[in-house]
Amino acid sequence: MRNSMKIMFSADGISKSDLEKTATVSKYVDCVKIGHILCSTLSFKEIHELVGDKDIFLDFKLHDIPNTVKTAIENYSKAIPNFKYFTFHGTASDEMIKAALTADTQAIPLAVITLSSDANFDKADSLAKFQRCVDLGVENFICHPHLVADVRAKFGDKIKLYVPGVRLESDLSDDHFNALTPKKAKELGVDYIIVGRPLLRAENIVEKLKEFEC
């Protein structure tokens, strides 16, 4: 049986206010997702000081020659405290995907098939790309909100789905126009939801988090 849906915090805000809120939000979640924006603003040491001993999800969407990807992952494992997850492009070559899966790290690799902000994608083509990754051994995916139902129907509980762009009804106004609500995400079998701006914008972060818990 699948465990209850969990929340990951996407921490890419870099203003003074955003960084202060990032430190606060991090106290109440298990995992913090960081990307190019935050990592080009702060050092890994500064990020660790900001979020504490939380699991780190490195969202760099790696896509390069196999050895470069493998070496980068292994080096990040040494450089980032509590390195737990990383993303790579699921549309890359078989060899690169295998390199991401076999890198010497305890971090969990997540394949990205389609960006959550992309409204123009071919569903059948996307599902075929999921199948190819599954055949190569991928078990964890960043999943477009509008693909969750189809992916669950096709693969059942064989894979875990991490879904960005999850919004409350009151927040469905920014560039994640393809968003799911937390309730719908849970109904569709999402394992992890990734939430950023709604938490950074919240006046009461603890209360806002409760609205996302299902």
Whereabouts are the PLM-identified features?
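A C-terminal functional module that forms or caps the active site or interfaces directly
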Residues: 34, 38, 44, 144-194
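Active-site cofactor/substrate anionic-group-binding motifs, chiefly glycine-
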Residues: 33-34, 53-65
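Conserved anion-binding
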Residues: 3-7, 64-162, 168-173
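Glycine-rich phosphate-binding active-site loops on the catalytic face of alpha/beta enzymes
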Residues: 83-93, 167-168, 178-208
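Generic structural signal for well-ordered alpha-helices
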Residues: 19-23, 44-48, 73, 94-101, ...
